[in-house]
Amino acid sequence: MANDPRHLPSRKLLVTCALPYANGSIHLGHMLEHIQADIWVRYQRLRGNTVNFICADDAHGTPIMLKAQQMGITPEEMIAAVSEEHQKDFAGFDISFDNYHSTHSEENRELASHIYLELKKNGFISSRTISQLFDPEKEMFLPDRFVKGTCPKCKSEDQYGDNCDNCGETYSPTELINPKSAVSGATPVMKDSEHFFFDLPQFESMLKEWTRSGSLQSETANKMQEWFESGLQQWDISRDAPYFGFEIPGEKDKFFYVWLDAPIGYMGSFKNLCNKRDDLDFDEYWNKDSKTELYHFIGKDIVYFHSLFWPAMLEGSGFRKPNNVFVHGYVTVNGAKMSKSKGTFVKASTYLDHLDPECLRYYYAAKLNSRIDDLDLNLEDFTQRVNADVVNKIVNLASRNAGFIAKRFEGKLSDNFAEPELYNEFVAAADRIAELFEAREFGRAIREITALADKANQYVDEKAPWVVAKEEGKDQELQEICSVGINLFRVLMTYLKPVMPALAARTEAFLNQELTWEGIAQPLTGHEITKFKALFNRIDPKNIEAMIEASKEDAAAEMAAKEKAEAAKTETELSKDPIADEIEFDTFAQVDLRIARIISCEEVPKANKLLKFQLDIGGETRQVFSGIKSAYKPEELEGKLTVMVANLKPRKMKFGMSEGMILAAGPGGSDLWILEPHEGAQPGMRVM
């Protein structure tokens, strides 16, 4: 027991939630994890522990790159907008992050590179040529999640190329049955490419020991044992250009796979927090011999990455491992998978438009335990439970006593506390409730609290202050009865403070005192409270109906946008940009097209679209300005061959003379491609 961190005088904890992907909105499924973690974090703070609670957006990968292209903006612009939306949603639910960052940050780039280079130095990185699925229409290698097909194990259809949502199996996309490109719908072809691998099997003995440490949930430990029995495989940590992410140090057109730098995002976000504050030391929390505690809250769909790859990467690069990984199940609504058509796929922002976030915090807490069970948000039960527990049992306890204290005793509680034994029974429950909060058995903690609320209301019912108030000479008895009721309410709200922080804050204003775990040891006597105001409103079923309807409208709008995008895919380039009127051959022959080699390319200061080129056209050098800055970095173009209009009249521009035109194709923005001749063409050759 002496080594149990729960019994240390004061603890230092670093707590994380899984990083939401930066290409979509937060929904009520996400909120389960963030509410669960926030309750645990708030409980730890309430007990005097030091907690740093961090998160970030997972901002890399092909899905983000492609979606940004569809939107006609840069990936950086897209992830910035999504981050703002995510943080607003989490703030709306009172998720008390100390820092919210992005994996697309300098801190994360430096840490990812450092960890990779340490792993490489220590012999845990190797490379080999692999055959990989390639989209022949889009001319790009396909990431795992952009290949869909039939699971090779359970034969479920429409599964992603890295793992099966149905059976949880992980596999290579080349193992999928009947694979299709999720980008174009084309059947992928095999193409060779050099990839880099993390040697996970070297860490098997360490991972087995970590699994047997006794801290992991039994379901997680059992699942890991299955993976050990089936054999650990080397992990492909690289992806080919084009890709939105971090380039691998020392390699060209090779990028870190998003799942390598995503968990490092925990470190990056904490590093960012350390840079903002003078009282935090990054090494104290991440050194191999750290005495602090590290906990990850995640969903069951990403256990493989967090229980195998992540601790192995940390071990191999000289960092500490997590104390535990807390895994939760999925959210269902009304007993079924969340459905956009039924309006039960509810965005966090849509919920906040219609309902109090404290209601969902309470309901999730009432149904959460330490196991990996799915949680059903039954909307009828949700309404009944919140109204019955929070409004009728707990808040009503204050309202039915506060009026008498305000009207008859000028807001002052009795000097004498009439029911010390009853009060001590409520206070004695603190240890049991604390154990349940610590163990993430929130549902059991809520049952303990509501059972106490029943006892408190029973006391008030039996004493009937509304009757005593009518009897002469019983003012002291009335004051004492109501003071007991309000003090019992104070204890209950202290226990509920991690679950319902906004209600707790209103309670503190009403009681004119902060709610603290230690403070409830003694009741309030002779204490002045403020005039009672409504602390909490019951759920109106009409608001739930409005939320469902709004979710249906959101889904319909998304579907319309998706159909429009799909229609755009089938639209031909000719239909978008019809062929111009015919011209005579002699007219065309007047245009002198020449092969040119790009000698140098540089950005033009204060020009948003232009790149400045020096072109070799075979014995002559031309200066040309071209508006393709949005599609290319200057260093990518130097040394390439291209095609230019050589006899175009020179044009004087603000930034200099342009002596021709480089030919490029595409709709604009990042979708522009310069024309490149086949090998063998030489600068100065005429294009016929």
Curated annotation (Swiss-Prot):
* GO CC field: cytosol
Cofactor stoichiometry and binding remark: Binds 1 zinc ion per subunit.
Q: Where in the cell is it found?
A: Cytoplasm
Say which enzyme class the record assigns: ligase
UniProtKB keywords: Aminoacyl-tRNA synthetase, ATP-binding, Cytoplasm, Ligase, Metal-binding, Nucleotide-binding, Protein biosynthesis, RNA-binding, tRNA-binding, Zinc
Which cofactors does this protein require? Zn(2+)
Find motif ('KMSKS' region) and give its ranges.
337-341
CDD domains in UniProt: Anticodon_Ia_Met (cd07957), MetRS_core (cd00814), tRNA_bind_EcMetRS_like (cd02800)
Q: Which GO terms describe its molecular function?
A: ATP binding; metal ion binding; methionine-tRNA ligase activity; tRNA binding
Catalysed reaction equations from the record: tRNA(Met) + L-methionine + ATP = L-methionyl-tRNA(Met) + AMP + diphosphate
Q: Where does this chain carry the motif 'HIGH' region?
A: 20-30
- What stretch or stretches form a coiled coil here? none
Q: Which residues are involved in binding Zn(2+)?
A: C151, C154, C164, C167
Q: Which residues are recorded as binding ATP?
A: K340
Q: GO biological process annotations for this chain's record?
A: methionyl-tRNA aminoacylation
Protein's UniProt keywords contain Transferase: no
Functional note? Is required not only for elongation of protein synthesis but also for the initiation of all mRNA translation through initiator tRNA(fMet) aminoacylation.
Please report which protein family the annotation says this sequence is part of: Belongs to the class-I aminoacyl-tRNA synthetase family. MetG type 1 subfamily.
The name of this protein is Methionine--tRNA ligase
